[in-house]
From Swiss-Prot:
Family to which this protein belongs: Belongs to the RNA polymerase beta' chain family.
Protein name: DNA-directed RNA polymerase subunit beta'
UniProt GO cellular component terms: DNA-directed RNA polymerase complex
Quaternary state and interactors: The RNAP catalytic core consists of 2 alpha, 1 beta, 1 beta' and 1 omega subunit. When a sigma factor is associated with the core the holoenzyme is formed, which can initiate transcription.
Enzyme class (EC, first level): transferase
Annotated function: DNA-dependent RNA polymerase catalyzes the transcription of DNA into RNA using the four ribonucleoside triphosphates as substrates.
Protein's organism: Chromobacterium violaceum (strain ATCC 12472 / DSM 30191 / JCM 1249 / CCUG 213 / NBRC 12614 / NCIMB 9131 / NCTC 9757 / MK)
Residues annotated to bind Mg(2+): 460, 462, 464
Cofactor, how bound (note): Binds 1 Mg(2+) ion per subunit. Binds 2 Zn(2+) ions per subunit.
Catalytic activity as recorded in UniProt: RNA(n) + a ribonucleoside 5'-triphosphate = RNA(n+1) + diphosphate
Gene label: rpoC
C-alpha cells in the first residue's frame, strides 16, 4: 500500500520558489530541455490514429499516448514503469508527460528571433548600432554586410548590394568577408566585445553634450550592460535550435467523419519543418546559391510566423483564409493566456438565478431556492447521509438525493446552518459587489436579496441575475463570515459613509410617518409613554401626523459608561413617537424628531454606527426597513395626473421671457450685439425663465392652505404625493418634476450645444410635434453615450487597478513627519468641502496648535476621529498638516499611519489591507454609474445661467488680494485690470472667511476695508464677452490694423452695420501680414506716445484674435474704457461625458493641448524682440540671468512689462500642464491640483470620494524617478528607475561613504506607470505583452512576486489580507529566522531560473 501511495507522490512535483527570472535561452539550454529532435512534419497516422515516429506528435520524444502503455503494446501496466520499449522506443510512464516534454528542431540555417528584431525599439538594432531597415535587408537576403573588411578600405558592418559585392569581389578577391542572412548578423553579434563597447560608450557619454545623443547612448548602454550583467550572449537572439511545444498543448482532435481539428501551431510547425528539411537537402545537393538563399529566407519567414504571425509582412493563413494563431497570440490580449486563464478563472460550486425582494430577511440573510441549495451543497449532504447511516456508499447517497426523500431536506437544513454563501452581481465594480450571507431555504426558483444591500450591489429587481458561490474550506468559511458578511460591510470603502441606507419605499414610509400636520385629529394630546400613543393610534383617536406631547425614556451614558434611563418630555408627532421604539440605546430622540428624508436617514445610520457600534446599527437598519415598508403601505401614496400642478404664473412668466427675447432680437438688428452674444443672451433668458417657473411650481406644490385649531388659515407643507416622493428623496427630483409640471426647458444637441428654442410645454400639457422632435435629440444622445461610456469607464478602472495593485499596508508607522497641509476647499468662495471632512480619519503629521493660546491641542501622530475634528472646528483652526500616502517613506508598500482610517471599518487601517485596489475601485466604480446617469433627465439641458456678479456670503471686512489691480474710469467706477484678482472677506477675528475671484474687466462695487453685510454685491460684469481695457487715457492710434490683412470688416446682413474683427494669423494671406500684430498706441495732447508708468516703454495694447474693435482711430479714451471685446463661446452642457475623459486625462498625466505657461524662475518680466509667429518673454532672476520663453502670438499673456513673478506662477493663459506643476511647484502642489480637479468632476455628479484614494493613485504615478547624476551608483544618467530602488541604493552608498545618486521626480500616467513597474509579469498581463516580455528577457529581469497580480498569476495566495501572514511565515522559514523578526519584503533567496 505504501508503495502505491509513494507512486502518487512522484507524479506531483511542486517547486517552492520566491522569484521568477526570465532570460534568453542559449541553444544548449534549448537542447537540454528537449527529449528528442522532431525530424518529420507528419502528425498522426490517419488509419491507426497513432502518432508518426519523429513527427510532431512522436511518442518516443514526447511520451506515451495512454497511461503506462508503450506505443506498440509490448509493455502495459504499472509494473513496467520507467522501462523504455526496445521496439518502439517509448518510455512507459504517465501520458500527462505529453504536456511537459518539449522537443526541438535543429535549424539548417540560423534564424533571427522576430521579437528582438521587430518589437520596437529593435533590440538587435540597439545592440549592433544599426538601423532596423539595414538589419532587415541583411536578414531577408537583400544585401551583404561586411563582417571582416581585412586590409580593404571598406567599413566594418557596411552594407553592399548584390552588384557592389560582385564588384568588390573582383576588386579585392579574398581580402574581405561579407555575408548575408541570419548567419551574418550572428557573426556580427559574436564579434561584439561587450566590455570594450561599454567602456567606449561610457567615455562618450561623459564627453558629449547633445541631448539626443545622450539619450541614444544611454539606451544602448542599458541593453549592453544588461547582457553583461546577466551573462547572456547577444548571439542567442539568433536561433539555431527551435524548441517544440509539448503536443498536448497544441492538440489534434479527431472529429466525426474522419476529419481532424488541429491547433494552428501544428500548421506553423509543419511549415518550419518542411522548409528546414528542404533546405538541408538543398545544402547536401550543393544547390545554386540563389535557390539556397531563397529557401533560407522562407525558413526565416516561417519561423517568424510561428513565433509572432503577422508582425512582419502578411500573416500566414490557413485553408480558410484566416491568419493562423501563433505563439505570441496565445499569450497576449484579452483572450490570451494571461488575462483569460491566469487572471480570470471559472469556479465550481456556483449557481445563478434571478433575484427578487426579500423584505422579511435580516441583513445577514439571503433566500436560497431549495433546488439550488440541494445542488450546491451535494457533497456535504452525501457525507452527512453516510455518517447518519442512511446510505452506505456515495452511489446510494446520490440516489437518495435524486429521489428527494424527506430526510434529505432535514439534512440540507442542517448543512446550510451557519454556512455562509457568497452572492455576486456582475459587473463587480467594487469589493461590495461580492458579499456573504447565511442562506435561508425558500420555495421557488429565485434568490431573495435583502433590500438594503441593493445599493452596494447596484441591483434592482427588474430581472437582474446574481451568482452564488459556496466557500468550501474552513478557512474560506471563516473569512466569508468575518470579512464579507453583509453585516460587516455597513460603510462604503469609497467615502466611509453608510452604504446600507434605506431608499425608495422605505424612505417614503419613514418620511410619511414622521411628517407633521396642522390641526390633525387629536392635536395637542399628551401621552405618558409610547404604548399609549400606540393605543390611541390603533383606535383611530389620532392620525400619524398629529402633533402631540409625549413622555419618553432615553438612555444616556454615565461616568462609568453604563446606560442610565432618563425621562424627557417631547413635543412631537404620533409617527415619530411610534418610531422611537426602535431606536438603539444611546441614540437621542432628537435625531428622529423631524421629517426623515433620505439624507437624514443616512446621517441617522452614520451617527448610530459611531455611537452604538455595528451590531446595534445593523439591527436598527433592519427595523427601519420593516417599519418603512409597513408605513409606506399604510400611507397609500400614489401618483395621479392632478398631482402635477402647473403653476398659475407660468403663462405670465413665458410672456415676459418672450418680450425680453424680442428686445434682444431688436438690439441685434440694430447691431448693438453680435450673433454670438444674441444667442447666449437668449439661451440665458430661457434658462432663467425655466428656473423661475420651476421655482413657482415647487412653491405651489410644497405648500397648501389649511385651517388651524383657531380656524385661521395657515400654510403647511403639502401632502401632494409627487412632492412627497421628491422631497423625501425616495424617487424623482426637482428637475424631473419641473418637466412634468413646469416647462421642459432648453434641449441640448448631441454635440452639447443648446438649442435656443426652448420647450415651453410640460409632459402634463403634452408636447407639440416640433417639441417632441427637438427632444429626441437629447434623449437619443443619452442612450448612445451610455453604451460607449460603460466601456471607457471599465477600461479606466482596469488601468487604475493595474497601477495600484501592489500597494498594500505592510507596516504600522514609517516614522515620517512629512505630509500635506489641508485647508477647506473653496470654490467661487463657497466652502464646498469643510476642513473637518478633509482631515477626518487622517493622522496628524505635526502638533496641532491652538491659534489663540499657542498650546498644543493634538499631538503629532494622532488619528483624527469625530471628537478631535469637532475640537479643531471649535478652535477655529484653518489648516492642519496631515500625513498622506504620497509622502509615506515605506518602501514596497505603505504604512498604516500615513493612510489613516480604514474607511469601511471606521478605525485605523490593518496591515495587509490592499488599499491600492480599494482606491482604484472607489474611483472607478462611480465612473460606470455616472456614465449611466445621462438619460434620466431625458437630455434636457442643465446649465447654470452665466454668472454676471459675485456676492459676499458672510458679514465682514473686504480686503483685496495682493494681485488685485484696478483703475477708476471717467464715471468713477473701479475697473479690474488683472486676471488673478480676488476679493477676500475677513471676519471680526481677522480670519479669512471667503475668497471670491473677480474677472478682468469687472466693475468693483466695494472698496478695500469696507464693512459689508452678507449678500452684498462685490463686483459685476458682462458674462458674454471679455473686454480689452486701457489703463491709461489718451488718443487712440492704431498700428497694423489693416483692413483685409490683419482685421476683417464684418457687415451684419440683418443690421447692415460693420465692425472690425481681428483675423487669426493662420488664416491671413501673405507672409508679411502673418507677422503683424494689430495694436493700439495712445498719444497725449502733444501727440507724443504715452509711456508706461516708471519706464520709457510706450503703452501698447494688443488685440487678440477674434477681438471686435469698438474704438475708432483718433478717438479719445479715458482710463478703464473698453477698446475691444472678445465674444465668449456659447457654453455647452457639462455632464460626465466631459467628466470621465477628464478623469482619465488627469490620471494619464497628459499635457493639455495649448497649455498655459508657468514661470521657470522668480524674477522680473520684460519683453524681447518678437520672432515670426511668437513673442519673446524674458524673466530676469535676482542674479541677473535671463530666461526666455517664446509664446505664440495668439496666446494671452497674463503678465506685463516690469511685473515680478514667482517661480511656478502662471504667465500665459491656458490649462496647466501637471508636469510643469511638479517641476516648478513640487509634489504637494501637484497632488493638490490633481485631487481638486478629479474631485470637481465627481462633485459635479454628487459622488463623494475620499481624497485618500486619489492620493494613493498619485503616489503610484510618482513612483519612478529620473537619475540626474549617478554618483558612484550603477545607474545611468537620464535613466528612469523605481524610487524605492534609488533610496535603497543611496542608503548603501551612504553606508560606504560613497557618492549617492541625485534624482528628480517624474510624473507618469497610469498606463505608463503600470507598464514600467518592476514586475514584468504584472506589466505583461496588462498591455503590450510582446514588448514587455522582450525587454524583460533582454534585461534578464527577475520578478520578486511582490504584487497581488503576480501572485495570482503564479497561483498562490496574494500578499494582502489573510495571505500576508502566509507570505510572512514562508519568508521566515526560508530565511530561518525566529518568528519574532518580521522580514517582510526582503530580496528573495532562490530564484526559479528559466533560462540562464
Amino acid at each position: 500500500m505504501k508503495a502505491l501511495l509513494d507512486l502518487f507522490k512522484q507524479v506531483t512535483q511542486e517547486e517552492e520558489f520566491d522569484a521568477i527570472k526570465i532570460g534568453i535561452a542559449s541553444p544548449d539550454k534549448i537542447r537540454s530541455w528537449s527529449y528528442g529532435e522532431v525530424k518529420k512534419p507528419e502528425t498522426i497516422n490517419y488509419r491507426t490514429f497513432k502518432p508518426e515516429r519523429d513527427g510532431l506528435f512522436c511518442a518516443r520524444i514526447f511520451g506515451p499516448v495512454k497511461d503506462y502503455e508503450c506505443l506498440c503494446g509490448k509493455y502495459k501496466r504499472l509494473k513496467h514503469r520507467g522501462v523504455i520499449c526496445e521496439k518502439c522506443g517509448v518510455e512507459v510512464t504517465l501520458s500527462k508527460v505529453r504536456r511537459e516534454r518539449m522537443g526541438h528542431i535543429e535549424l539548417a540555417s540560423p534564424t533571427a528571433h522576430i521579437w528582438f528584431l521587430k518589437s520596437l525599439p529593435s533590440r538587435l538594432g540597439m545592440v549592433l548600432d544599426m538601423t532596423l531597415r539595414d538589419i532587415e535587408r541583411v536578414l531577408y537576403f537583400e544585401a551583404y554586410v561586411v563582417t571582416d573588411p581585412g586590409m580593404t578600405p571598406m567599413q566594418y558592418r557596411q552594407l553592399l548590394t548584390e552588384e557592389d559585392f560582385l564588384d568588390k569581389e573582383d576588386q579585392y578577391g579574398e581580402e574581405f568577408v561579407a555575408m548575408m542572412g541570419a548567419e551574418a548578423v550572428k557573426e556580427l553579434l559574436k564579434k561584439l566585445d561587450l566590455d570594450a563597447e561599454i567602456e567606449g560608450l561610457r567615455r562618450e557619454l561623459e564627453t558629449t553634450n547633445s541631448d539626443t545623443k545622450i539619450k541614444k547612448i544611454a539606451k544602448r548602454l542599458k541593453v549592453l550592460e544588461a547582457f553583461q550583467r546577466s551573462g547572456m550572449k547577444p548571439e542567442w537572439m539568433i536561433l539555431e535550435v527551435l524548441p517544440v511545444l509539448p503536443p498536448e498543448l497544441r492538440p489534434l482532435v479527431p472529429l466525426d467523419g474522419g476529419r481532424f481539428a488541429t491547433s494552428d501551431l501544428n500548421d506553423l510547425y509543419r511549415r518550419v519543418i518542411n522548409r528546414n528539411n528542404r533546405l538541408k537537402r538543398l545544402l547536401e545537393l550543393r544547390a545554386p546559391d540563389i535557390i539556397v538563399r531563397n529557401e533560407k529566407r522562407m525558413l526565416q519567414e516561417s519561423v517568424d510566423s510561428l513565433l509572432d504571425n503577422g508582425r512582419r509582412g502578411k500573416a500566414m493563413t490557413g485553408a480558410n483564409k484566416r491568419p493562423l494563431k501563433s505563439l505570441a497570440d496565445m499569450i497576449k490580449g484579452k483572450g490570451g493566456r494571461f488575462r483569460q486563464n491566469l487572471l480570470g478563472k471559472r469556479v465550481d460550486y456556483s449557481g445563478r438565478s434571478v433575484i427578487t425582494v426579500g423584505p422579511t430577511l435580516r441583513l445577514h440573510q439571503c433566500g436560497l431556492p431549495k433546488k439550488m441549495a440541494l445542488e450546491l451543497f451535494k457533497p456535504f449532504i452525501f457525507h452527512k447521509l453516510e455518517v447518519m447511516g442512511l446510505a452506505s456508499t456515495i452511489k446510494a447517497a446520490k440516489k437518495l438525493v435524486e429521489q428527494e426523500v424527506p430526510e434529505v431536506w432535514d439534512i440540507l437544513e442542517e448543512v446550510i446552518r451557519e454556512h455562509p454563501v457568497l452572492l455576486n452581481r456582475a459587473p463587480t465594480l467594487h469589493r461590495l459587489g461580492i458579499q456573504a450571507f447565511e442562506p435561508v431555504l425558500i420555495e421557488g426558483k429565485a434568490i431573495q436579496l435583502h433590500p438594503l444591500v441593493c445599493a452596494a450591489f447596484n441591483a434592482d429587481f427588474d430581472g437582474d441575475q446574481m451568482a452564488v458561490h459556496v466557500p468550501l474550506s474552513l478557512e474560506a468559511q471563516m473569512e466569508a463570515r468575518t470579512l464579507m458578511l453583509a453585516t460587516n460591510n455597513v460603510l462604503s470603502p469609497a467615502n466611509g459613509e453608510p452604504i446600507i441606507v434605506p431608499s425608495q419605499d422605505i424612505v417614503l414610509g419613514l418620511y410619511y410617518m414622521t411628517r407633521d400636520k396642522v390641526n390633525g385629529k387629536g392635536e395637542g394630546m399628551v401621552f405618558a409613554d409610547t404604548k399609549e400613543v400606540h393605543r390611541a393610534y390603533e383606535t383611530r383617536q389620532v392620525e400619524l401626523a398629529t402633533r402631540i406631547t409625549v413622555r419618553l425614556k432615553e438612555w444616556e451614558k454615565d461616568e462609568q459608561g453604563e446606560f442610565q434611563p432618563v425621562i424627557k418630555r417631547y413635543n412631537t408627532t404620533v409617527g415619530r413617537a411610534i418610531l422611537s421604539d426602535i431606536l438603539p440605546k444611546g441614540l437621542p430622540f432628537e435625531h428622529i424628531n423631524k421629517a426623515l428624508k433620505k439624507k437624514e436617514i443616512s446621517k441617522l445610520i452614520n451617527v448610530s454606527f459611531r455611537r452604538c457600534g455595528i451590531r446595534d446599527t445593523v439591527i436598527f437598519a433592519d427595523q427601519l426597513m420593516y417599519t418603512g415598508f409597513a408605513y409606506s403601505t399604510r400611507g397609500g401614496i400614489s401618483i395621479c395626473v392632478d398631482d402635477m400642478q402647473i403653476p398659475v404664473k407660468k403663462s405670465e412668466l413665458l410672456g415676459e421671457a418672450n418680450k425680453e427675447v424680442k428686445e434682444i432680437e431688436e438690439q441685434y438688428r440694430q447691431g448693438l450685439v453680435t450673433q454670438g452674444e444674441r444667442y447666449n443672451k437668449v439661451v440665458d433668458i430661457w434658462g432663467r425663465t425655466g428656473d423661475k417657473i420651476a421655482k413657482a411650481m415647487m412653491d405651489e406644490l410644497s405648500k397648501q392652505k389649511v385651517l388651524d385649531r383657531e380656524g385661521k388659515e395657515v400654510d403647511q407643507e403639502s401632502f401632494n404625493s409627487i412632492y412627497m416622493m421628491a422631497d423625501s428623496g425616495a424617487r424623482g427630483s426637482a428637475a424631473q418634476i419641473k418637466q412634468l409640471a413646469g416647462m421642459r426647458g432648453l434641449m441640448a444637441k448631441p454635440d452639447g450645444s443648446i438649442i435656443e428654442t426652448p420647450i415651453t410645454a410640460n409632459f402634463r400639457e403634452g408636447l407639440t410635434v416640433l417639441q417632441y422632435f427637438i427632444s429626441t435629440h437629447g434623449a437619443r444622445k443619452g442612450l448612445a453615450d451610455t453604451a460607449l461610456k460603460t466601456a471607457n469607464s471599465g477600461y479606466l478602472t482596469r488601468r487604475l487597478v493595474d497601477v495600484t495593485q501592489d500597494l498594500v499596508v505592510i507596516e504600522d508607522d514609517c516614522g515620517t513627519s512629512n505630509g500635506f497641509t489641508m485647508k477647506a476647499v473653496l470654490q467661487g468662495g463657497d466652502v464646498i468641502e469643510a476642513l473637518r471632512d478633509r482631515i477626518l480619519g487622517r493622522v496628524t503629521a505635526v502638533d496641532v496648535v491652538d491659534p489663540s493660546t499657542g498650546e498644543t491641542v493634538i499631538e503629532a501622530g494622532t488619528l483624527m476621529d469625530e471628537h478631535l475634528v469637532d475640537l479643531v472646528d471649535s478652535l477655529g483652526i484653518d489648516e492642519v498638516k496631515v500625513r498622506t500616502a504620497i509622502t509615506c517613506d515605506t518602501r514596497y508598500g505603505l504604512c498604516a499611519k500615513c493612510y489613516g482610517r480604514d474607511l469601511a471599518r471606521g478605525k485605523q487601517v490593518n496591515a495587509g489591507e490592499a488599499i491600492g485596489v480599494i482606491a482604484a475601485q472607489s474611483i472607478g466604480e462611480p465612473g460606470t454609474q455616472l456614465t449611466m446617469r445621462t438619460f434620466h433627465i431625458g437630455g434636457a439641458a442643465s446649465r447654470n445661467a452665466a454668472a454676471s456678479q459675485v456676492e459676499g456670503k458672510s458679514n465682514g471686512t473686504v480686503r483685496f488680494s495682493s494681485q488685485m489691480r484696478y483703475v477708476a474710469n471717467t464715471k468713477g467706477e473701479l475697473i479690474v485690470i488683472t486676471r488673478s484678482g480676488e476679493v477676500v472677506i475677513h471676519d471680526d477675528m481677522g480670519r479669512e472667511r471667503e475668497r471670491r475671484k473677480v474677472p478682468y474687466g469687472a466693475t468693483l462695487m466695494v472698496t478695500d476695508g469696507l464693512q459689508i453685510k452678507a449678500g452684498a454685491v462685490l463686483a459685476t460684469w458682462d458674462p458674454h464677452t471679455r473686454p480689452i481695457i486701457t489703463e491709461y487715457a489718451g488718443r487712440v492710434k492704431f498700428e497694423n490694423v489693416e483692413e483685409g490683412n490683419t482685421v476683417a470688416k464684418q457687415t451684419d446682413e440683418v443690421t447692415g452695420l460693420s465692425t472690425l474683427v481681428v483675423i487669426d494669423p493662420k488664416r491671413r494671406a501673405g507672409s508679411q501680414s502673418k507677422m503683424l500684430r494689430p495694436l493700439v498706441k495712445l498719444l497725449d495732447d502733444n501727440g507724443n506716445e504715452v509711456k508706461l508708468a516708471g519706464s520709457d516703454a510706450s503703452v501698447s495694447i494688443t488685440f487678440q484674435v477674434g477681438a471686435i474693435i469698438t474704438v475708432r482711430d483718433g478717438q479719445d479714451v479715458g482710463k478703464g474704457e473698453v477698446l475691444a471685446r472678445i465674444p465668449q463661446e456659447s457654453s455647452k452642457t457639462r455632464d460626465i461625458t466631459g467628466g470621465l475623459p477628464r478623469v482619465a486625462e488627469l490620471f494619464e498625466a497628459r499635457s493639455p493641448k495649448d497649455a498655459g505657461m508657468l514661470a521657470e524662475v522668480t524674477g522680473t518680466v520684460s519683453f524681447g524682440k518678437d520672432t515670426k509667429g511668437k513673442q519673446r518673454l524674458i524673466i530676469t532672476d535676482l542674479e541677473g540671468n535671463g530666461y526666455e520663453n517664446l509664446i505664440p502670438k495668439d496666446k494671452h499673456v497674463l503678465v506685463h512689462d516690469g511685473q515680478v513673478v514667482n517661480r511656478g506662477e502662471s504667465i500665459v493663459d491656458g490649462p496647466v500642464d501637471p508636469h510643469d506643476i511638479l517641476r516648478l511647484q513640487g509634489i504637494e502642489a501637484l497632488a493638490r491640483y490633481i485631487v481638486q480637479e478629479v474631485q470637481e468632476v465627481y462633485r459635479l455628479q454628487g459622488v463623494k470620494i475620499n481624497d485618500k484614494h486619489i492620493e494613493v493613485i498619485i503616489r503610484q504615478m510618482l513612483r519612478r524617478v529620473i537619475i540626474t547624476d549617478s554618483g558612484d551608483t550603477e545607474f545611468i544618467q537620464g535613466e528612469q528607475v523605481e524610487r524605492a530602488d534609488v533610496l535603497e541604493m543611496n542608503d548603501k552608498m551612504m553606508a560606504e561613504n560613497k557618492e549617492p545618486a541625485q534624482y528628480e521626480n517624474v510624473l507618469l500616467g497610469i498606463t505608463k506607470a503600470s507598464l514600467s513597474t518592476d514586475s514584468f509579469i504584472s506589466a505583461a498581463s496588462f498591455q503590450e505583452t510582446t514588448r514587455v516580455l522582450t525587454e524583460a528577457a533582454i534585461m534578464g529581469k527577475r520578478d520578486d512576486l511582490r504584487g497581488l497580480k503576480e501572485n495570482v498569476i503564479v497561483g498562490r495566495l496574494i500578499p494582502a489580507g489573510t495571505g500576508l501572514a502566509y507570505h510572512r511565515t514562508r519568508r521566515r522559514q526560508n530565511l530561518g529566522l525566529d518568528a519574532g523578526e518580521s522580514m517582510l519584503f526582503d530580496p528573495a533567496p532562490a530564484a526559479l531560473e528559466s533560462g540562464e
